[in-house]
Amino acid sequence: MSTPASTPAPDGSHQRDHHPGTRVEFRGVTKVFTNNKNTETVALDDVSLTVEPGEVIGIIGYSGAGKSTLVRMINGLDTPTSGALLLDGTDIVGMPEAKMRKLRSRIGMIFQQFNLFQSRTAAGNVEYPLELAKMDKAQRKARVREMLDFVGLSDKGRNYPEQLSGGQKQRVGIARALATNPSLLLADEATSALDPETTQEVLALLRKVNKELGITIVVITHEMEVVRSIADKVAVMEAGRVVEYGSVYEVFSNPQTTVAQRFVATALRNTPDMVEEEDLLFHEGRLFTIDLTEDSGFFAASAIAADNGVSINVVHGGVTTLQRQSFGKITVRLTGNPAAIEEFHRSLTRTTTIKEITR
């Protein structure tokens, strides 16, 4: 697979495919829908959020959290009831449709259900937005070949969607989204219809898009594993609000809200559930679940406890490395000198989060 180099624009000029990416900024955006009975539904509630050029941000939340409304705002399919939405410093709220159409040419989008034309080949699907852009035929064909090669489908150009696997269809969708040389890519539940192995392949391709082409990527998902695999930052949404925002490491290692904690737990099973706790409590000793970070003090406290007659066994949990930093939770069973166990507990209370598991 090759990396696209330069692309002829419809006017014949050449554009570099690697660019700084688009900056996206929400400023106090609220969206209220009113039905025919004048009942109001708040889909977005005072959302303020900034995505820097070249970043990959994961927007995560359960159904009804406001994720899809957020992405529809970015490509101009919905407009805020109040607030401002800026792309590269330009407020697009109230922008005339002609200007909005031009702006959309800088935005690519991929979907959960691929949205391919069944009557067109893979190459024909990738070519479609170039036809709309009135690109010269020879240039279109060259660009299609370039894009199919970039996504690893150089031998599938003549295949129709029904002849492709789910992962291949999504690759065609990505190639089509990239065909017009966008600076922003919106991925709306792009891996939800794929099996785990294919999901990782598609995420690897999106990482390649970001790293090699410099494109800003906004990933809408309800799967924390997707965020963990690809994102630099994560925004957690609930009831139309961004309730938590930070680097992937910050949110995974120390989630502050209940909804964020639930999402993190689906990706990192480091804490025993109720059934596992009951099994562990059958045995002698005291059980503690401990947050591990590079400065948690666990290993120093463990060494002191061991020197004072305490046996320490790890019975559950694990350590994860994200963004070159390690963190995790472990559950340990301590037996031996009661006073030394209590000192171990007090010591870690000062440096990290430690919780005793009791009946």
From Swiss-Prot:
Disulfide bonds: none annotated. Residues 24-264 form the ABC transporter domain. InterPro entries: AAA+_ATPase (IPR003593), ABC_transporter-like_ATP-bd (IPR003439), ABC_transporter-like_CS (IPR017871), ACT-like_dom_sf (IPR045865), MetN_ABC (IPR041701), MetN_ABC_transporter-like (IPR050086), NIL_domain (IPR018449), P-loop_NTPase (IPR027417). Residues 1-21 are annotated as: Disordered. One of its GO terms (cellular component) is plasma membrane. Its EC number is 7.4.2.11. It is a peripheral membrane protein. SMART domains: AAA, NIL. The complex is composed of two ATP-binding proteins (MetN), two transmembrane proteins (MetI) and a solute-binding protein (MetQ). Part of the ABC transporter complex MetNIQ involved in methionine import. Responsible for energy coupling to the transport system. Belongs to the ABC transporter superfamily. Methionine importer (TC 3.A.1.24) family. This is Methionine import ATP-binding protein MetN. It comes from Corynebacterium efficiens (strain DSM 44549 / YS-314 / AJ 12310 / JCM 11189 / NBRC 100395). The gene is metN.
